[in-house]
Regions:
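N-terminal capping/small domains of soluble enzymes
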Residues: 1-141, 330
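Glycine/Thr-rich beta-alpha phosphate-binding loop at enzyme active sites
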Residues: 29-30, 34-43, 112-115, 174-187, ...
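Short beta-strand/loop segments at the ligand-binding rim of alpha/beta enzyme cores
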Residues: 54-62, 136-143, 198-211, 273-285
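Hydrophobic faces of well-ordered beta-strands that scaffold small-molecule active sites
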Residues: 61-65, 85-87, 114, 141-145, ...
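Catalytic cores of alpha/beta
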Residues: 70-77, 152-160, 212-231, 275-279, ...
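Generic structural signal for well-ordered alpha-helices
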Residues: 74, 123, 127-131, 153-161, ...
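Glycine-rich phosphate-binding active-site loops on the catalytic face of alpha/beta enzymes
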Residues: 84-93, 171-175, 236-243, 289, ...
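C-terminal helical cap(s) of enzyme catalytic domains, especially alpha/beta-barrels
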Residues: 94-110, 246-259, 310-334
Length: 334
């Protein structure tokens, strides 16, 4: 990570956020480069082996949705040593997303605020890229889907599910108009009923956050969503999406906060859910993780897997290996 922190990151951060993101994507699309350097990021230990919704993982560290929105470099991300990778979020039709500026850095807090609004090339382009990915029987590839109607969600599911290991249903982006309809229990139940009729692979549901500094309790709305997931036999929930914030520097005036500032909230949410629901549902922890110690705390709290995004931007491609190395030591010492 020294090269990244002293050379690569300053170069990326000298550019506006979206321009540096585009540059990173160009580099990540060089799949042969990442395959050739994969040994630099390799760390395997049986103590990290686990299962998630029946899927056998080499380790519990996953790439969160949003990093590779259009399935352009998932095979490169797999070379970094993730236990699984999530592509998307994919929508049925192409979307331009929200107007710019729509991505901000908060360097002191190693955080980001985004109001992207699901920009992407749409379902058919993503499906074609999934079909063309190198065959790897050990790879766990998950796809995040979203939409504002049940029909759109089902179309995404039925098109994608034969090409991936599981589907994560995003009902919780704070940046997409119309999506909040599925944050109502009745509508979520109808959505999950429709998805279950066509289900061939595990389904995860990505929930909105429910804890802030003023209220350390689960809200009625979130409890209703979890109950809907349990009733519909969802295979796992992802806790949680970005925290909604307002910021006048964004064109739309609001967005979602991600990064290190979220870790304590994430840990509190996992503790709260597990204390109430125990082993009734599997949980992916997402938000603020950048160290093996933090991953260990979440696993001890009951998380089945850990998802990374913003910490990769700040710490670089060696982060996954560092987290796994420290996590393995902690698991062996318990």
């Amino acid at each position: 990570m020294s090269f990244y922190s002293h050379i690569a990151r300053p170069a990326f951060f000298s550019l506006p956020p979206e321009k540096s993101q585009h540059l990173a994507e160009i580099l990540l699309r060089q799949s042969l480069l990442w395959k050739a350097t994969s040994k630099l990021f390799s760390f395997e230990d049986e103590v990290l082996h686990t299962e998630l919704a029946g899927l056998k993982l080499r380790n519990p560290i996953g790439l969160a949705a949003g990093f590779d929105k259009d399935i352009q470099f998932l095979s490169s991300m797999e070379q970094l040593g993730f236990g699984y990778v999530i592509g998307g979020t994919i929508t049925k039709e192409p979307r331009s997303g929200n107007p710019s500026p729509r991505l901000l850095r908060i360097r002191k807090e190693k955080s980001l605020i985004n109001s992207m609004g699901f920009p992407g090339e749409g379902l058919q382009a993503a499906a074609k890229r999934l079909e063309n990915l190198p065959v790897d029987p050990s790879a766990i590839r998950i796809v995040s889907i979203s939409g504002t109607t049940i029909d759109d969600m089902v179309t995404c599911q039925t098109t994608i599910q034969t090409l991936c290991s599981a589907i994560e249903v995003n009902i919780s982006s704070p940046n997409t108009a119309g999506l909040r309809i599925f944050q109502e229990q009745t509508h979520l139940l109808k959505l999950l009923e429709a998805l279950n009729q066509n289900k061939k692979v595990p389904i995860f549901v990505k929930l909105p956050p429910f804890i802030d500094s003023q209220d350390k309790s689960m809200t009625t709305e979130i409890r209703d969503l979890i109950e809907a997931c349990l009733k519909s036999e969802v295979d796992a929930i992802t806790v949680a999406n970005t925290i909604p914030v307002e910021d006048t520097r964004l064109a739309v005036g609001k967005g979602g906060l991600s990064g290190s500032k979220l870790f304590e909230n994430t840990l509190s949410m996992i503790n709260t859910i597990k204390s109430e629901y125990g082993t009734k549902i599997e949980v992916n922890a997402c938000g603020g993780v950048s160290t093996g110690e933090q991953a260990y705390q979440l696993i001890q709290a009951g998380a089945n897997s850990i998802q990374l995004y913003t910490s990769l931007v700040y710490e670089g491609p060696g982060l996954v290996k560092d987290i796994k190395t420290d996590l393995a030591k902690l698991l062996k010492s318990q």
